[in-house]
Amino acid sequence: MVNEFVKKLREDIWQLAEPVIASEGLELVEVECLRMKTRWLVRIYMDREGGVTLDDCSEISNQLGDVLDVHDLPPDPYTLEVSSPGLDRPLVRDKDFVRYQGCEVSIRLEQKVDGIRNFRGRLLEYVEEDGRKILVIEMASKLYRIPRDLIVKANLVYRF
């Protein structure tokens, strides 16, 4: 029940945040909603070509805070954090997997594929097969076909 509430809250905040962020020429990357002891923590990750500035974060925080307050989301006190996605950018939407083909990624699955739950390798392709979206990952010189719907978390891997 709690997970469904958090999922719905995340979706509702995403719907409100996306047009606010887009109006400033930015792209919404991810929304996280975490229930803390006495309040909610809402994290908004956004990006644009050339990166996000501190002024961008401040402006979106002010605008989005007002929008969330008007819609009473979340329904209890909350802290709003707005930032860039960082070097280990989360991969959330289909277009993220398409955009970052050829890049190194880290993927955690809800169940094992070929005996493996955590993958770290190069994202070679993102395709649709028989109505199912599949990531083709090269890891340790072997190819793995990972169903998109099994992914719990996916991020870019940045090498220093």
UniProtKB/Swiss-Prot annotation:
Instruction: Kindly list the residue ranges recorded as spanning the membrane.
Output: none
Q: Which residues form a coiled coil?
A: none
Q: Which GO terms describe its biological process?
A: ribosomal small subunit assembly; translation
Domain of life from the UniProt record: Bacteria
Q: Name one GO cellular component term.
A: cytosol
Which family is this protein grouped under? Belongs to the RimP family.
Q: What is this protein called?
A: Ribosome maturation factor RimP
Organism in which the protein naturally occurs: Syntrophus aciditrophicus (strain SB)
Q: What is the gene called?
A: rimP
